Design a protein with these regions (language model features):
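A short hydrophobic beta-strand segment most commonly corresponding to one strand
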Residues: 1, 56-58, 109, 122-139
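A short, N-terminal "cap"/entry segment at the start of jelly-roll beta-barrel domains
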Residues: 1-65, 140-143
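A short beta-loop-beta micro-motif enriched in histidine and acidic residues
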Residues: 36, 49-54, 65-82, 123
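Short, conserved beta-strand element in jelly-roll/cupin
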Residues: 58-62, 75-92, 130-133
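Short coil/turn motifs at secondary-structure junctions
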Residues: 64, 117, 134-135
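Short beta-strand His + acidic residue motifs that chelate non-heme Fe in jelly-roll/DSBH
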Residues: 72, 91-93, 110, 115-122
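Short acidic-glycine-tyrosine-enriched beta hairpin
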Residues: 96-114
Length: 143
């Protein structure tokens, strides 16, 4: 009888070294080039600094809210997503949670692939969103 072979150690993916990212508020950094046409995004430099591990941006939703445009059920194929309300309020629907009014200071996580939508928001709403990984797919669903 031979001695059983040792279990192989899991291969750990080596990521490039992360760097420091500093982002100061500048109005000109808000761009209408993101996922939603009714939003402006301020990239905080996290995706580049983390080599795609994570993404963080400030989202400014453009008012007034048009529910016909924004209330589209969808999900994101992500590993992690969290949102923090910096200013104003946003009313959301999340599968398994229902409708929730998030006000300044509110924070929430959305599990991977959870179906959700925005129902309404204040004209001054700003959100901080952190997502892993930085590149991900969004899937629009039939209502």
């Amino acid at each position: 009888r031979g001695v059983p072979a040792p279990k192989p150690k899991p291969v750990r993916k080596v990521r490039p070294k992360q760097r420091i990212a500093i982002s100061h508020h500048r109005e000109e950094d808000f761009k209408a080039d993101g996922l939603r046409a009714y939003a402006q995004y301020r990239d905080l430099g996290i995706a580049e600094a983390s080599h795609g591990l994570a993404q963080a941006h400030v989202i400014r939703l453009i008012g007034p809210c048009n529910p016909a445009e924004v209330s589209k059920l969808h999900f994101h194929d992500v590993e992690f997503q969290m949102v923090y309300v910096l200013k104003g309020w946003v009313k959301t629907y999340m599968e398994g949670q229902g409708e929730t009014l998030m006000k300044e200071g509110s924070a929430w996580t959305q599990p991977p692939r959870i179906k959700h939508l925005i129902m309404d928001y204040s004209d001054d709403v700003e959100l901080l969103e952190v997502i892993l990984p930085a590149e991900f797919k969004t899937v629009e669903l039939a209502s």
